[in-house]
C-alpha cells in the first residue's frame, strides 16, 4: 500500500502513549477540531499534499478455518453470505491489477482466505502472478496470505514481491474477543518474518469491534514498536451471519479521533483509511485527510461494495490534495471518463465480480 516510512523532520516528535490515551477521547467540539488540525499539520509536514491509492484482489475466497468474528469468509459462520471459490489463475490477478492501476493504485495486493497458503500449486500460482505484475504493470506487488512461513516469503520475494500485509486486527488485550483459532504471537511472528526478509510492512486493524479507546491506543503502540511502514485503518462494517453482526458502530467522531491519534503516534508511517469508511463516516469521509491519513482505497472491498474510482479521486482533489500516481515511467492522468467508469463497473459485475473485481480493503487472510 505504500513506500517505506518517511524520515521525520527534527521538530516532529511522536506523542507518548499517555498523551494518546487522553487525546483519543477528544471526540467532539473544539477539542476534536484542535486534534484534527494538529494531525493535519503533521501529515502535511511529513507527507506533503499527496494521497496514495491501493488495490487488492480477493484471489481465493471463503471456507477459512479461522474464526475471526468480523469475517464473513470464516467456515465457522455458515450463515454468512460470502463468495466461495478456489485460487484464481495468475492471469486473472494481473488483469485486475491493470484495472486498479488505471484507477490510480500504486500497489496491488493478492489476498487469499485461509490460515496460510498450504498447497505448493497455490504458492506457485502466486509466484507467477507476482512475476507478471512486475513485468507487465507499474504497481508494486503485495501479498496478504495469512500466517505465512518464512520459506514462502523467501520464494515470494525472489519472484518480485515488495510488500507483505498482515493485520493485527486489534490490541493484544482484546484479541481473544475477536479470534481464538490462532494467537497474537503467531501474528507478530508473521510480521517479523516478513521484516527479516526485507519486505515493506503493512499492518493495521479494525476499529469498532467492541474494544475501548485505550485498546485502540494499545494497538497503535504495538504497530509503532514493530516499525510498520503502512498502517491500514478499518472500521467495522458488520457482516450478516457473523458474531459481530449486531455490534454497535462507533461514531464518525470516534473514527476521526482514532485516525488523528494514530497519525500523531506514528508521524512517519503511511496511514490509509480503508474498509468501513462509507458506513462509519458517511458524508464526513473527506475529513480522513484532515485527521492525518495520506492514503485510501479505490473501489470495492473483499465482500462488500465501496466507492468507484471517480468518486474517490474527486474526494481527494476537493480537499486540495494530489493523487500520487502510479510510477509508470510516463505521464499519467486518471481517466474519469464515463467509458472508464463503465469498464470498472463491468469488471465488477461479471463472474469475477463475485471475487471482488477490482477491490481494495482490509485483508488478513481474506477477512473483510
UniProtKB/Swiss-Prot annotation:
Region Disordered, residue ranges: 347-368
Domain of life (superkingdom): Bacteria
Domain Radical SAM core stretches: 46-277
Species of provenance: Anaeromyxobacter sp. (strain Fw109-5)
Protein name per Swiss-Prot or TrEMBL: Biotin synthase
InterPro entries: Aldolase_TIM, BATS_dom, Biotin_synth/BioAB, Biotin_synthase, Elp3/MiaA/NifB-like_rSAM, rSAM
Enzyme class at the top of the EC tree: transferase
MF annotations from Gene Ontology: 2 iron, 2 sulfur cluster binding; 4 iron, 4 sulfur cluster binding; biotin synthase activity; iron ion binding
Alphabetical list of Gene3D superfamilies matching this protein: Aldolase class I
Single Gene Ontology BP annotation: biotin biosynthetic process
Subunit structure: Homodimer.
HAMAP family named in the record: BioB (MF_01694)
Cofactor: [4Fe-4S] cluster; [2Fe-2S] cluster
SMART domains associated with the record: BATS, Elp3
Role, per record: Catalyzes the conversion of dethiobiotin (DTB) to biotin by the insertion of a sulfur atom into dethiobiotin via a radical-based mechanism.
EC number(s) reported in the record: 2.8.1.6
Family that this chain belongs to: Belongs to the radical SAM superfamily. Biotin synthase family.
Catalytically driven reaction(s): (4R,5S)-dethiobiotin + (sulfur carrier)-SH + 2 reduced [2Fe-2S]-[ferredoxin] + 2 S-adenosyl-L-methionine = (sulfur carrier)-H + biotin + 2 5'-deoxyadenosine + 2 L-methionine + 2 oxidized [2Fe-2S]-[ferredoxin]
One Pfam family cited in the UniProt record for this chain: Radical_SAM
Pathway: Cofactor biosynthesis; biotin biosynthesis; biotin from 7,8-diaminononanoate: step 2/2
Database matches in NCBIfam families: bioB (TIGR00433)
Binding site for [4Fe-4S] cluster: 64, 68, 71
TM segment ranges: none
